[in-house]
Amino acid sequence: MKYYCEEKDLVIRQLDSGENGLSQAEAERRLAENGKNKLAAAKKDSILKQLLKQLADPMIIILLAAAAISGVLAVTQGESFTDVIIILFVVVVNAVLGVYQENKAEKAIEALQEMSAATSKVLRDGKIVTIHSEELVVGDVVLLEAGDAVPADGRIIENASLKIEEAALTGESVPVSKFIDIINLTDGEGDVPLGDRRNMAYMGSTVVYGRGAMIVCATGMDTEMGKIADALAQASDGQTPLQIKLTQLSKILTWLVLGICVIIFAVQLLRAGGMSFEVVLNSFMIAVSLAVAAIPEGLAAVVTVVLSIGVTNMSKRNAIIRRLTAVETLGCAQVICSDKTGTLTQNRMTVVDFFGENEQELAKAMALCCDAEIDDEGNVTGEPTEAALVAWANTLGLNKTALKSSFPRCGEAPFDSGRKMMSTLHLAPNGVVQYTKGAPDVIIGKCTHYLKNGEAVPMTEDYRSEILRSNKAMADKALRVLACALRIWSAQPDDCEPETLEQQLCFVGLTGMIDPVRPEVKDAIDECKAAGIRAIMITGDHVDTAVAIAKELGILREGDRAVTGAQLSQMNDEEFEREFQNISVYARVQPEHKTRIVSAWRKAGYVTAMTGDGVNDAPSIKSADIGVGMGITGTDVTKNVADMVLADDNFATIVGAVEEGRRIYDNIRKAIQFLLGSNMSEVISIFVATILGFTILKPVHLLWINLVTDCFPALALGMEKAEGNIMRRRPRPAKDGIFAGGMGFDIAYQGVLISALVLAAYFVGHYIETGVWTITDSADGTTMAFLTMSMAEICHSFNMRSLRGCIFTMGTKNKALTWAALGSIAATTLVCEVPFLAEAFGFTPVSFVEYVIAMGIGMLGMVIVEIVKTFQRRAMRKRGEIL
């Protein structure tokens, strides 16, 4: 229904209401019939469905397959169900952790929304009552005044200089002056753009000036905001870089496990020398059991726990992560497209300069000649520019409330965009004083005098030139400049028309104001530059203001361009793709421009983050690799589509989150390299032993190492602090595989190294037990191999504190890793030396000398890896890479 094309009286009748509103009974009936006035929350999956989603992870599927095979072995061969129980325990813990962390983020978002739960003043039974905005129904008459959030869509039916900011919907930050008259469609015009419907008010917008009333035409999902929310709910999310890499890793592990099965199965058949059913079944079971033991059971849980730790750390830094895997995506961010207002700046217009003889007199005049108000706690409400003037006066000891008592308003000529000024009349001890404020060029032209030593003296050309120079100097700094003048009346004039009041004025002064940058953002931008991250400013503000802020922050580099939305619209796709990397500032942009900008960067292969707060920002946030919503000023729709919500709306928080994302990805890589290197050593050891015809370790031994010896140090690696160079590296390309940067080589050589040490320990144990060097089964050899493998992998976890740095010169400590290592050593020792445990695991307790030798051999690996890292660092320096 196009209510903006209808007379207000007709709209009221069509909605079965009246200018005195609905009756309480009718409102309750409509509420019961149509539901609450709120946006439908995104349909939440049940706990069961959330758990099933966690189980759909490729790494988890491999573990479930391993558990199934182990279960078959247990049933058919009478084996223990220990393997099955342990693997399923790991799977359940991983799934529960994932669900818990993501629900925790949703609860944080809900808490933010509850903090901003709104109320509305409505007419019910002809009386003004305050109700929760979600209880509004179609036909309610809502009273609007400065500072109110518009709670639903409605037709304006009363207007007293009403101005509404609709930036959340239209992207246009300039408040829209509203009226009551109908809007007529021109020939061939099917609809009127939302921003031009000046007799309508929409959910998500804010009243910044004046008063008025509207009759509610649409609530909840039927509002314009609701329609956008519904469209966004249909869009699907893509995979994060980490999800893609873990999927690739799962495929590699799957083929590796299958390869192990085939090779060991073939070797067992050849050694058996026959193809009887019993031989084939036995060979198959041995191959499968060893392959199951070769899977890094703790990897999925480690990744989930590391991500969860990162999410917790980020929440402490005001970044609420809504998707667990999005944490890592932040680490490879290459471009951050940021709003200006509130994110780079303080979202608070502030007077930073003035011109005039008397600052106190100028502040008093400006504060009285505006409609912004201040409460007892110093909180100012009103149109941003006027709020800045009242706040400025307050800092000078001129409280607006006190000023109003001393100089009560007795008349006014409201602001008009045609006149570009407003005037107010106030009772004063010597009669009536008039204050007029507005555009400098207009005010100056109406001034015949200026204030000097508290007296009005005739305006001179020299002083007029001085005023104009000051005005230009402020404007050149991208300040918003207002002029103020006064006029003294002996008594209140009979005629308060502007033509009567606004002449023969006495100039008082100029104020220059700007939304100042957040003090911490400059350092954050510098940190982005050092980290190889490009910051792009996107704003609905004027281009001159945007450029001034961008230069101050260092966003606008030498040779970079600033373009307006209009200029962007004139560029075709080919031109824009050729130019976009040279553009650092976009001003006066529309919502569709933001999506176009994000798409251009993504198409060029850059991992892109996009911030936003309004409903109109939601599509661009959804289209970015990392959508960042605002927790304070952001709409619910924007928060719901974002991957991350900033609780403080601060750009510096994004940079902190990027650093945390890099740390998390580093730690995940460290854990993966540690676990895969350890598992490779197990696979090689078992493979060599199988080829040579002896048993070095049993599957249960490998499962113990994977889940006890390896898992806790791997988790501790996830708590490793960020390395000193983490924000001096270039962002890693999202397409880089999990084994990029030489990690594949490292896993291979470290796996070979540890397996060589384990085999050496086995033969030393065999020699100590038998006194001869032969290739046969040995109880002492198996125990020593187990001790060496455990010790080598525990020591290897310390190597992994830095993939290239020397662990002996690291300035930080990892207490969690130290305790995990000590616990793993103690558990390994108990399993081998306590008789009933040793018997359960098939070990023969060894002598103290054998124990020391086995552990000593295991420690050799750490020294050798550090020596190799020394050569790797030298190679990196030659290539000019950051260490």
Q: What are the language-model segments listed below?
A:
Residues 1-731, 736-739, 752, 767, ...:
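Conserved cytosolic headpiece of P-type ATPases
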Residues 264, 755-763:
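Transmembrane alpha-helix/helix-exit interface in multi-pass inner-membrane proteins
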Residues 681-682, 746-758:
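Core segments of transmembrane alpha-helices
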Residues 709, 782-797:
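Generic alpha-helical transmembrane segments
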Residues 761-764, 768, 790:
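C-terminal substrate-binding/catalytic lobe of Rossmann-fold NAD(P)-dependent dehydrogenases
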